[in-house]
Amino acid sequence: MKNILVLFGGETTEHDISILTAIQVCDSFDVLKYNVVPVYINKNGEWFLVSDIGSVARFLKSEFNIKNRCVLNYDGVLSVGKGLRSKKITIDYAFICMHGINGEDGTMAGLLDLYHIPTVNCGVESSSIAMNKILFKKFMLAIGVPVIDYFDVRSVDEAIMRLNKKTKDGRFLFPLIVKPARLGSSIGVVVCNNIDEYEKACVDGLMLDDSLLIERCLTNFNEYNMAVYNTEDGLVVSDIEQPLSLSKFLSFEEKYLNDGKGDGMENISRVFPAKISKNLQSEITLYAKKIYQELNMKGVVRFDFIYDNQDKKLYINEANTIPGSYSNYLFRNKQISFTHMLDDLIAYARVDYINKKNIIKTFDTSVLKEYSNSIKK
């Protein structure tokens, strides 16, 4: 039976959302195939093995037995407790359920790579690019995928100066949208209708991140989402959903606080499958596959698109490399259960790990010997 490490929580503004995703993932494994090893990382960065992940109350109290404190060793073994009585668990595969910084941004993927643990999620490069909205936009432009007009800033003064300059050419008029570069779940995202709101949004946003993305705000648009993951037989694409928002963009409250259900994107009002033309469906699918392949992605990735009803143009908004609930609900009409998806992800992670293991990472040289000889002379 394979030991599956599920990492969640973490030092991130999306800490609580991560817990909800982990609960859903852990509840969906085939217990006859896998031994699930849930590890909670608290807001101080401490790791704990969790015996009953379904109990949300314990996370509210944040009370965990020090005996369950654990550490991941370089050999891929999880050590629980201290001393001679510490428990050792050899990890076979890992699922990262950590949204936002210190998890979804590639940091955890990098750690698992160093410890030679196969993970089902995107690697360091694709994770870090997708997490940074500014880098992601630049990459999209480089591969020919359309994005909404934007500029980026690192200070309030720069934000005011850049806006004044952009306003002169008529491209950036209110309303505008301000987004922290590396946050998800719509945290810190503000629609600004005037200069005062804009300045305040920039001040608040720079308390959450060191750089901001400023976008032209569309006023007549629809949002469309599609998820993709890879298997040994090729890419699997979900049906397309159309989220329905009461505001100008889908807020954190609508995603996670609606009726207290806490199911994230699965809980929002939406049209599913989206009632769109075959041409638009094909365009969304084409771009989703292209981005997935160009960024060399792995695991489940949800792509969020925006369609401008006025200009009849489709734009990529963002890619979520660790989407809430692993976007399992988008595959239901494909007759793919969450359990089946998890099996697929593990199977592909195994193949991917073997392929990467065969890559030569080191080689012998005479550099040190020659350097040593030169010193002796």
Map each language-model feature to its residues.
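ATP-binding N-terminal substructure of ATP-dependent carboxylate-amine bond-forming enzymes
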Residues: M1-V120, V124-E125, I129-M131, L135, ...
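Phosphate-binding site of ATP-dependent enzymes
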Residues: N193-M265, K275, N279, K313-L314
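Short acidic-glycine loop/turn motifs at beta-strand connectors
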Residues: N42-G45, N230-D233, D308-D311
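Hydrophobic beta-strand scaffold residues
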Residues: V36, P118-T119, V147, L176, ...
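Active-site nucleotide/adenylate-binding loops and adjacent lid/helix of ATP-dependent enzymes
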Residues: K2-F8, T12-T13, I19-I23, L84-K88, ...
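A short glycine-rich, hydrophobically flanked beta-strand micro-motif that places a catalytic Asp/Glu
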Residues: V37-V39, L212-R216, Y224-N225, N296-Q310
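ATP-dependent carboxylate activation and anion-phosphoryl transfer catalytic cores
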Residues: K2, F8-E11, G144, K275-K377
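Short beta-strand-to-turn element immediately C-terminal to the catalytic PLP-Schiff-base lysine
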Residues: V153, V189-N194, V228-T231, D308, ...
